Amino acid sequence: MEMDTAVENPAVEKNGQPTPSSTSTATDAAPTPNAPNRPAPNTAGNRKRGVPEGVWRKCDSCGASLFYKEVQQRLNVCPQCDHHFYVSAWERVAQVLDDGTFEPMNEHLRPTDPLEFRDRRSYAERLVGEQKRTGLTDAVLTGTGMIRARRVAFAVTDSAFIMGSMGSVVGERLTRLIERATEQNLALIIISASGGGARMHEGILSLMQMAKVSAALSRYHAAGGLFISVLTNPTMGGVAASFASLGDLVFAEPKALIGFAGPRTIKATIGIELPEGFQTSEFLLEHGYIDRIVHRKSLKTEIATAIDYCGK
């Protein structure tokens, strides 16, 4: 005997009207009699709001979360551990020179690509990218300005532009600045922030700048000039091996990395453990390489005092 296995569809019309289904997902179904008719929850007010960019920053040294404006007011120094953050060349100008006194020199000198050097991209393309990203035409700003009403020749390198490396334009700008200081009997202040040394993209042309700038400094010294060199983090390679180490007075910011090859390179090359704090400002002060460690907030005053003391 054949068995009828059909099951009545609960949604089939009866008497011309659809029957409610317990499995129906229709959104217009009437609410259950006993359920309260609640409004839809307001989820907009409960959304987690992200912290806007540029409000907080993390200290590279102690890891503290810092209010960005407070760090800026302290000249980009951590209020917790005194770590000195990177600052750009233009920020250095604002921190050290009297307001509105900086007169840039030789900004028309621009680097070229005489060797048509290429690594991951061409040197010419790299230069254009760095200029757009940093707003600088090369890794050094040079010019004249006032420090506590004392006129000086002033230069600052910027590690953001190809690690602050010294190419032919950096060397030429520095040489012309030193010659101006010699002619006008100005104190010379160079703040170094160069982790790249001589710029490999220009080959021997960049290495020649070490000798050229050093020779200009020799003539400046012979004329009785006062050169104050300020070393910041990092000052390495050909910059440290030439003009940055030739100051009559050599100041350094706290805990700056200063040397020729970096600690990792030395360890990988000769395979020895380096002394604790090797190549830091504190280590170099202890061993007589620098004259004084100067906190960023005191740098302007220390330079002005040194100029007065030396009669410049």
Swiss-Prot record:
PROSITE patterns membership: COA_CT_NTER
Textual note on the cofactor: Binds 1 zinc ion per subunit.
Molecular function in Gene Ontology: acetyl-CoA carboxylase activity; ATP binding; carboxyl- or carbamoyltransferase activity; zinc ion binding
Cofactor list: Zn(2+)
Major subcellular site: cytoplasm
Places the protein is found: Cytoplasm
Bias-annotated ranges (Low complexity): 18-32
GO-annotated cellular components: acetyl-CoA carboxylase complex
Organism: Rhodopirellula baltica (strain DSM 10527 / NCIMB 13988 / SH1)
Function of the molecule: Component of the acetyl coenzyme A carboxylase (ACC) complex. Biotin carboxylase (BC) catalyzes the carboxylation of biotin on its carrier protein (BCCP) and then the CO(2) group is transferred by the transcarboxylase to acetyl-CoA to form malonyl-CoA.
Keyword line: ATP-binding, Cytoplasm, Fatty acid biosynthesis, Fatty acid metabolism, Lipid biosynthesis, Lipid metabolism, Metal-binding, Nucleotide-binding, Transferase, Zinc, Zinc-finger
Region (Disordered) residue spans: 1-52
GO terms (BP aspect): fatty acid biosynthetic process; malonyl-CoA biosynthetic process
Subunit (UniProt): Acetyl-CoA carboxylase is a heterohexamer composed of biotin carboxyl carrier protein (AccB), biotin carboxylase (AccC) and two subunits each of ACCase subunit alpha (AccA) and ACCase subunit beta (AccD).
EC number(s) recorded for this UniProt protein: 2.1.3.15
InterPro entries named in the record: AcCoA_carboxyl_beta, Acetyl_CoA_COase_Trfase_b_su, ClpP/crotonase-like_dom_sf, COA_CT_N, Znf-ACC
Entry's family note: Belongs to the AccD/PCCB family.
Zinc finger (C4-type): 59-81
Domain CoA carboxyltransferase N-terminal: 55-312
Protein name: Acetyl-coenzyme A carboxylase carboxyl transferase subunit beta
Residue numbers binding Zn(2+): 59, 62, 78, 81
Catalytic activity from the UniProt record: N(6)-carboxybiotinyl-L-lysyl-[protein] + acetyl-CoA = N(6)-biotinyl-L-lysyl-[protein] + malonyl-CoA
Pathway(s) where this gene product acts: Lipid metabolism; malonyl-CoA biosynthesis; malonyl-CoA from acetyl-CoA: step 1/1
The encoding gene: accD
